[in-house]
């Protein structure tokens, strides 16, 4: 990812962008709009296909070369004009050199007709970093998944069924990698039966390569001065489903109603993602209101725990950060959240070495190193060291994010009721005592470690870690703090009249009453972060017994990745894949015995602000048969079945 860079552009006398790297235009100099409508929209018969979509149905477009986003915006404009209200559009596009936001704005200004759609795209075009980036528009009716990186690296990671392809890289002679047999094979793997394809080129080697991959191709009239272009239909075999224990359950058909148990961030995000797709969701919370447990802290930090080695957790964090950061634009900045940045201090030699590796691996607009003097000027207080600065990060008031998500139309909240789930016929029923409060064909468990109270999830290896935060009254002197600063703990600039300081880690205690010892421990964490800020707060003179705070349980898994996805019936799973206990390399051709309509979203640990909202989108994609918003390997690394598989291979049953 260290080679990730934005597009380098030149601008011609008409204000149109040209790629400096490829020496080519992004669209027709005569009429880019008409070219897009002819080559991509008409060739793929999108007007009639959009109009024919049923309620809840989705059409997925795949694109090679996002460029200025012109093709996406034209497709969205057409979709909005002709598609039924209950239909949805998913658009997946790969781009190695995304435009910087200022360049994108300048390019899209050429098309005043598209201004409403362009402004919506520009409003979401932030925290756009390498990997999979999920953007949502029109209340969730239109989804855009950007794969930012080399197409030959990104497309093999994609799990999708594409109905229509836009092949729109720069000209084959100038960008041959985008027109290679390897790429055509990926298009075939990702294609739905009878998927259509349009491209501006008529090059013979492109036509032959697509035919070899399984597309029936023909030359058709091109646009403008271009005599011919290519049109095609996929007629090859369906792709191999892969390992059955990670295969998709059949997309949900029938009544689009769901129960979501748990009113924290994971539950609210899960409910919002389904409701945005037209589902009726009953959100059930045992407390009187939302965000009363780990999601209830006054300030949480958007802290990116990254690795220079592209681990599944690091890729999840990078994609999740962008998604959350875009969601936060809905909230009141300065009250519910603030993009004040996060500074991670290089508090010892090992941490300094880790930070140097990260700075070399990621773009500077995501993170960059600061010397001590630079860090102090930025933070506004004296610090013991420099560190790594994340300029787009900051703090969030998690209850506000939960409330915003739960306000999505289609969600009904049932609070103050603890429930158990029972399968009755084709529905899951939520019982409080002998009373069935709600029923639906689908249920999502999002109650952190308490998902183990539900028998199907009882054996999942989740653990609870108690954490306590301390609230400190802001002083005129402490208000100088301008960014979140982290070492072993963290301290945030004030929200209103209070700073939040934390957080402790206690692996043994089951008591949620705040303790003086942990308040003292948090003050020691603050002393390590900045003795100057400790003094500005007058913290040494504050009686511990007068300090306020709260404690909650984080929920984490043995590999520190969340559990997000469908759940299998354990005994049937063990029987279906018993051969793996003898030879883990076997892939039995037996369908996974899913528990019908049961899904999990749990185990987010201390990074739920980053991972839980995108996990809601991941669940919705599993359920609705949409493109996964994460690389397939990352989705599998978060799959609940990984622990059933691990126990089976290790011979650990029961």
From Swiss-Prot:
GO cellular component terms given for this protein: cytoplasm
- Sorted alphabetically, which keywords does the UniProt record give? Cytoplasm, FAD, Flavoprotein, Methyltransferase, Multifunctional enzyme, Oxidoreductase, S-adenosyl-L-methionine, Transferase, tRNA processing
Q: Does the keyword Endoplasmic reticulum apply?
A: no
**Cofactor(s) listed in the protein's UniProt record:** FAD
Molecular function (GO) terms for this protein are:
flavin adenine dinucleotide binding; oxidoreductase activity, acting on the CH-NH group of donors; tRNA (5-methylaminomethyl-2-thiouridylate)(34)-methyltransferase activity
Q: Name one GO biological process term.
A: methylation
In residue numbers, the region (FAD-dependent cmnm(5)s(2)U34 oxidoreductase) covers: 261-654
Coiled-coil residue spans: none
Query: InterPro entries of this UniProt entry?
Result: FAD-dep_OxRdtase (IPR006076), FAD/NAD-bd_sf (IPR036188), MnmC-like_methylTransf (IPR008471), SAM-dependent_MTases_sf (IPR029063), tRNA_MAMT_biosynth_bifunc_MnmC (IPR023032), tRNA_MNMC2 (IPR047785), tRNA_S-uridine_synth_MnmC_C (IPR017610)
- Record carries keyword Disulfide bond: no
- The EC number(s) given in the record are 2.1.1.61, 1.5.-.-
Q: Where is this region: tRNA (mnm(5)s(2)U34)-methyltransferase?
A: 1-235
**Belongs to which family?**
In the N-terminal section; belongs to the methyltransferase superfamily. tRNA (mnm(5)s(2)U34)-methyltransferase family. In the C-terminal section; belongs to the DAO family.
| PANTHER family in the cross-refs | SARCOSINE DEHYDROGENASE-RELATED (PTHR13847), TRNA 5-METHYLAMINOMETHYL-2-THIOURIDINE BIOSYNTHESIS BIFUNCTIONAL PROTEIN MNMC (PTHR13847:SF283)
Task of the protein: Catalyzes the last two steps in the biosynthesis of 5-methylaminomethyl-2-thiouridine (mnm(5)s(2)U) at the wobble position (U34) in tRNA. Catalyzes the FAD-dependent demodification of cmnm(5)s(2)U34 to nm(5)s(2)U34, followed by the transfer of a methyl group from S-adenosyl-L-methionine to nm(5)s(2)U34, to form mnm(5)s(2)U34.
What's the protein here called?
tRNA 5-methylaminomethyl-2-thiouridine biosynthesis bifunctional protein MnmC
* Organism listed in the record: Pseudomonas aeruginosa (strain ATCC 15692 / DSM 22644 / CIP 104116 / JCM 14847 / LMG 12228 / 1C / PRS 101 / PAO1)
Chain's gene name:
mnmC
